[in-house]
């Protein structure tokens, strides 16, 4: 039989695990910002399409954007938040709307 593993110490315990603290990933809010040009119906469509909101919730968030200047659409890990911002921005530009979507650390 081959002795390929002679270099492993006989004191080595395969069941021994090093305890490491695993931190949860940083989270980010995806935020829609108000402008004077994007129609309210389009904002609702964005919220339904990209954030899986029903019509009632999408309308509430749209009104918050309209009256308060911005609203959080969701909270995600950095990669997911970046993707959502890019999708919303691209879809808005394709439809000739200046809707501003940003991300902020939660």
From Swiss-Prot:
GO terms for biological process: protein catabolic process; proteolysis. Signal peptide: none annotated. Pfam families: ClpS (PF02617). Coiled coil: none annotated. Binds to the N-terminal domain of the chaperone ClpA. PANTHER family: ATP-DEPENDENT CLP PROTEASE ADAPTER PROTEIN CLPS, ATP-DEPENDENT CLP PROTEASE ADAPTER PROTEIN CLPS1, CHLOROPLASTIC. Involved in the modulation of the specificity of the ClpAP-mediated ATP-dependent protein degradation. Belongs to the ClpS family. This is ATP-dependent Clp protease adapter protein ClpS. The gene is clpS.
């Amino acid at each position: 039989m081959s002795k390929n593993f002679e270099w492993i110490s006989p004191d080595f315990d395969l069941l021994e695990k090093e305890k490491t603290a695993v931190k949860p990933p940083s989270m980010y809010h995806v935020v829609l910002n108000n402008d004077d040009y994007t129609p309210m119906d389009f904002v609702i469509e964005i919220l339904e399409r990209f954030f899986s909101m029903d019509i009632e919730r999408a309308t509430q968030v749209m009104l918050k954007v309209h009256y308060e200047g911005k609203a959080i659409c969701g909270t995600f890990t950095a990669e997911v938040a970046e993707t959502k911002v890019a999708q919303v921005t691209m879809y808005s530009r394709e439809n000739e709307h200046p809707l501003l979507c940003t991300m902020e650390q939660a």
